[in-house]
Amino acid sequence: NIIDNDIVIIAIDEKSISALGRWPWSRDYHSQLIDSLQDVQPQALGFNLLFTESGEYKEADRRFKNSIENSSFPVIMPVLQKTKYNDFYFSTHNTLLSTVDMTADPDGVIRRVRLIDDGYEIFLPQLSLQAYWATHDAGFQSNTIYDEVLIDYSFNKKTDFKKISYIDVLQGNYTREDFFGKIILVGVTAVALGDRFATPITTSHSSISIHAQVLNNI
């Protein structure tokens, strides 16, 4: 399975935590991230972050919502459940909802994923499937779309998905070619923040990289 160069990860890494401070961050940073990418024209941007807690400032939530609404590309937001802390993006026309749930096998290893989750009030596609739908006019047809599918992992240190540090994006340390026409996934890679799982090929794999693997399979 060959790595798709059109999938790029914006990494919430140790470098970004050191620069921006304690996690979770103000949603103003996410607003700045979306705004800074407007001119480079990615295909879509998906967050692997659950906004289930109160933001520090209501104005920051408002600015985040405005950045999503005014974005030139669709923004994919995961949802665990609708709360008073995340309802600001349920009412945003440019938001595509998704789920980021993953269930390990009994031995703790992530080998498979359900592309459509019907455990909500609505059917929610996985982040990876929603990203595919957002960027392919033909959609995705499969008899197994409601089943769990095995993940075909492709990973080694020399051929992994391109990762660009979150702080580098905020500071403009990237080229247009890094993101033009790309599908961007935003998520945690800093080991101290957790959100890591065992896979058949690694003992500790960031969940954002697993979502990228699933998108790569589709």
Please place each PLM-identified region on the residue numbering.
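Non-transmembrane functional regions of envelope-associated proteins
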Residues: 1-144, 179-218
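Substrate-access "cap/lid" subdomains that shape
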Residues: 138-174
